Amino acid sequence: MSRIVLASNNAKKLVELRRTFEGADTEVEIVGLSEVSDAPAPEETGRTFVENALIKARAAAHETGLPALADDSGLEVDALNRMPGIRSARWSGPHAHDERNLQLLLDQTFDLPDERRHGRFVCAMAFVDPDGTEITKVATMEGRIISEARGKNGFGYDPMFVPDAQPGDLTSAEMTPEVKDAISHRGQAVRAIVPAVVAHLEGR
């Protein structure tokens, strides 16, 4: 069985990524970064989601000697020039956390009319093998920003984002994990990268 390290110390993201990857029925053991390394997280200096995902995956592969899978995700709001974008996790400042980021999103969008509330979640997945192989995939989940937080599931901006790809009007934070995984940017990106990763590992 092959082992892959997930380059994330975000517990909720780790659970979501592991659940989605393992749901693909592959002979791969997923280990969290903190289980195999105490190295500090690399500085995310990239200008795109893909660049930042590669920075994290390369660092994890280098530190652990294991193939590494990393994601860089964020919210783009069209009316805010696609902000917060790659700064989604740190948007509200050096001590940013979900509640502060949500409040900032509310402050920035409270007076937007419905027709200007479109946005999307973006996820870039990067796989890096110490042998030099690199694979990347990008996926999005389109939707709209609402004017209040709803729901307790998920994390980040989920409580204020209503995905288009659903029959109802639930926020990402009101969906069950199974429903969210089926349509989410991260679920799509993981499902896109899994076949390429498995093919690479089987061909080593």
Swiss-Prot record:
The enzyme's E.C. designation: 3.6.1.66
InterPro entries, sorted: dITP/XTP_pyrophosphatase, ITPase-like_fam, RdgB/HAM1
Keyword Lipid metabolism set for record: no
Cofactor mode of binding and number, as noted: Binds 1 Mg(2+) ion per subunit.
Gene Ontology biological process terms in this record: nucleotide metabolic process; purine nucleoside triphosphate catabolic process
Residues annotated as catalytic: D72
Domain of life of the organism encoding this protein: Bacteria
Keywords for the protein's UniProt record, in alphabetical order: Hydrolase, Magnesium, Metal-binding, Nucleotide metabolism, Nucleotide-binding
Sequence positions that bind substrate: S8, N9, N10, A11, K12, K13, S73, F155, G156, Y157, D158, K180, H185, R186
Gene Ontology MF terms in the entry: dITP diphosphatase activity; ITP diphosphatase activity; metal ion binding; nucleotide binding; ribonucleoside triphosphate phosphatase activity; XTP diphosphatase activity
Catalytic activity: XTP + H2O = XMP + diphosphate + H(+); dITP + H2O = dIMP + diphosphate + H(+); ITP + H2O = IMP + diphosphate + H(+)
Co-factor requirement: Mg(2+)
Record's GO cellular component terms: cytosol
Sites where the protein binds Mg(2+): E43, D72
Similarity comment text for this entry: Belongs to the HAM1 NTPase family.
Physiological role: Pyrophosphatase that catalyzes the hydrolysis of nucleoside triphosphates to their monophosphate derivatives, with a high preference for the non-canonical purine nucleotides XTP (xanthosine triphosphate), dITP (deoxyinosine triphosphate) and ITP. Seems to function as a house-cleaning enzyme that removes non-canonical purine nucleotides from the nucleotide pool, thus preventing their incorporation into DNA/RNA and avoiding chromosomal lesions.
Subunit note: Homodimer.
Protein name, UniProt field: dITP/XTP pyrophosphatase
Source organism of this protein record: Cutibacterium acnes (strain DSM 16379 / KPA171202)
